[in-house]
């Protein structure tokens, strides 16, 4: 709810990914969707604060988006995997990190199934990765 309040300075970062857009998602709102080739070119140009591969897709936080958002006066929150957080920690040692995890792997699987957006195979892959 805090990110929906127009009077707050908090803004949720929009990540970039190579995964396919799900039904109802909007490019530039939910994620910045890129091809694998586009994403890899951005990696070569050092255009990410952090990036990682997860379940066969790239995910990353674009440097320019975060810089622009901060210049607008916002405090930016990133929702990233542990490997990405390690990269951010190296670049920004004073950043505040909060780790959130589901109570159990069964709860994680239940949440993923409840979304209704992924195949059983993809869900199992994500649970195994966790």
Curated annotation (Swiss-Prot):
Its EC number is 2.7.4.8. GO terms for molecular function: ATP binding; guanylate kinase activity. It catalyses: GMP + ATP = GDP + ADP. Its main location: cytoplasm. Residues 1-130 form the Guanylate kinase-like domain. Keywords: ATP-binding, Cytoplasm, Kinase, Nucleotide-binding, Transferase. One of its GO terms (cellular component) is cytosol. It is found in: Cytoplasm. It holds the Pfam family Guanylate_kin. It comes from the Bacteria. PROSITE patterns: GUANYLATE_KINASE_1, GUANYLATE_KINASE_2. Essential for recycling GMP and indirectly, cGMP. Belongs to the guanylate kinase family. This is Guanylate kinase. The lineage of its organism: Bacteria, Bacillati, Bacillota, Bacilli, Bacillales.
